[in-house]
From Swiss-Prot:
Activity control summary: FtsK may regulate the catalytic switch between XerC and XerD in the heterotetrameric complex during the two steps of the recombination process.
Name assigned to this protein: Tyrosine recombinase XerD
NCBIfam families on file: PRK00283.1 (NF001399), recomb_XerA_Arch (NF040815), recomb_XerD (TIGR02225)
Family: Belongs to the 'phage' integrase family. XerD subfamily.
Cellular compartment(s): Cytoplasm
Gene name of this polypeptide: xerD
GO annotation, cellular component aspect: cytoplasm
Active site residues of this protein: 163, 187, 259, 262, 285, 294 (o-(3'-phospho-dna)-tyrosine intermediate)
Chief site of localization: cytoplasm
One term of GO molecular function: tyrosine-based site-specific recombinase activity
Every Tyr recombinase domain range: 123-307
Bilayer-spanning residue ranges: none
PROSITE patterns for the chain: CB, TYR_RECOMBINASE
Length: 313
């Protein structure tokens, strides 16, 4: 790979172009090494472009920026309303990028090594009770093709614990109704097989036979859940559909998130005695600690039930 040599001169428009080239070289490198998703690469690119533009205003460049400068940059992001989670992601991006510059001998040091991680509040995922999930899944009017599609999508989400991006990205070749499993391509293009369950299989069969043909309008694309125009549905569109059905189901908007059924899937499995590592595998988490947050949700629910029903609660 051809490397762009860093200049010690004050950043100019030409050096701004060099910055962009180096960013793309870095993204190519981590994509090849780790197989990151397009969404992750896009987030890295936006973070580094923001830093590059800030460096121009400070008359700095990749070679001259120091740890104190990076602290100042992070502070400006927080002042602009960055949430702690976004700041933590930005810090991760900076560390990876400057480690890359150091490894490739484009810098003699790593100014990100001494950066501190913002303290993140421990948030429990928003979850729904089993009755609330039942109300949500019952909200679509299955007489209409679009609502039959939505019914199938909601059932699959809850049955399989998918991310919304995984759901809208499903192809017909990913579904085996005979075997009762889905092939899911998750983060980092990692593949996993997830069982569907009887309800999801039934509603998928109904939708594929009666709903999908009307939405596809003769198109031969492999998309499982098309939009009204027969094209791939966006995550934002499905999020609007979830909010629509939540209103019908009488669910408080504070309880909602795009992954509300994924969270319910994990919590309800644990409530019914599922092993944590099995839930980790079904969710497609690479790290068990990511899954362990759901044990706190299950514990909190048990505390509430104890207080409500135990004579000394």
């Amino acid at each position: 790979m051809t490397q762009t040599k860093l200049s010690t001169q004050t950043t100019t428009d030409n050096n701004q172009e060099d910055n962009d080239v180096i960013i793309e070289q870095f993204l190519d490198s981590i994509w090849l090494e780790q197989g990151l998703s397009a969404n992750t690469l896009s987030a890295y690119r936006l973070d580094l472009q923001a830093l590059s533009q800030w460096l121009v205003t400070q008359k700095l460049n990749w070679l001259s920026v120091t740890t104190l400068d990076l602290h100042a940059f992070l502070a400006t992001r927080l002042d602009e309303g960055y949430k702690a989670t976004s700041a933590a992601r930005l810090l991760s991006t900076l560390r990876r990028f400057f480690q890359y510059l150091y490894r490739e001998k484009l810098r003699q040091d790593d100014p990100s090594a001494l950066l501190s991680t913002p303290k993140l509040p421990k948030r429990l995922p928003k979850d729904l009770s089993e009755q609330q999930v039942e109300n949500l899944l019952s909200a679509p009017c299955i007489d209409e093709p679009i609502e039959l599609r939505d019914k199938a999508m909601l059932e699959v989400l809850y049955a399989c614990g998918l991310r919304v991006s995984e759901l809208v990205g499903l192809s017909l070749s990913d579904i085996s109704l005979r075997q009762g499993v889905l092939r899911v391509i998750g983060k980092g293009d990692k593949e996993r097989l997830v069982p569907l369950g009887e309800e999801a299989i039934y509603w998928l069969e109904q939708y594929l036979q009666y709903g999908r043909p009307a939405l596809m309008q003769g198109k031969t694309d492999d998309i499982v859940f098309p939009s009204l125009r027969g094209q791939k549905m966006t995550r934002q569109t499905f999020w609007h559909r979830i909010k629509h059905y939540a209103v019908i189901a009488g669910i408080d908007s504070e309880k909602l998130s795009p992954h509300v059924l994924r969270h319910a899937f994990a919590t309800h499995l644990l409530n019914h005695g599922a092993d944590l590592r099995v839930v980790q595998m079904l969710l497609g988490h690479s790290d068990l600690s990511t899954t362990q947050i759901y044990t706190h949700v299950a514990t909190e629910r048990l505390k509430v039930l104890h207080q409500q029903h135990h004579p000394r609660g």
